[in-house]
Amino acid sequence: MNDLKSKSNIKLMKRVLTTYELRKYLKKYFCLTLDNYLVLAYLDVFKNDEGKYFMRDIISYIGIDQSRIVKSVKDLSKKGYLNKCRDPHDSRNVIIVVSVKQHNYIKNLLSEININET
């Protein structure tokens, strides 16, 4: 194997290990999956005054399988991080609703995760 390929493989394995460690860390200390974390991070980054987000936008932006995001949103809803409902104008669309209190909790949680992670 050439030197460049070996270095590339090492970098890839480091990323895989980092992802694995992050998954374990989130689960152990925060009872979150990596998918949960990605959804919460999306809600924090794209915070808006209405606190409303379309599920399809979250799925599109995060770029992982739709079923994983749907499962994550359902889990986060049960845990009280967000609420979900059908769009009254088009029942095919799911709207994620996040109150100011929920946004503050998400922001604090993400800050805690980032502090502890370093």
Curated annotation (Swiss-Prot):
Induction behaviour: Repressed by SarA and agr, particularly in the post-exponential phase.
Single biological process term from Gene Ontology: regulation of DNA-templated transcription
Keywords assigned: Activator, Cytoplasm, DNA-binding, Repressor, Transcription, Transcription regulation, Virulence
DNA-binding residue intervals: 55-78
Gene Ontology molecular function: any one: DNA-binding transcription factor activity
Compartment(s): Cytoplasm
InterPro entries: MarR/SlyA-like, SarA/Rot_dom, Transc_reg_Sar_Rot_HTH, WH-like_DNA-bd_sf, WH_DNA-bd_sf
Pfam family, one: Staph_reg_Sar_Rot
SUPFAM superfamilies: Winged helix' DNA-binding domain
Entry's family note: Belongs to the SarA family.
Protein name per Swiss-Prot or TrEMBL: HTH-type transcriptional regulator SarT
Underlying gene: sarT
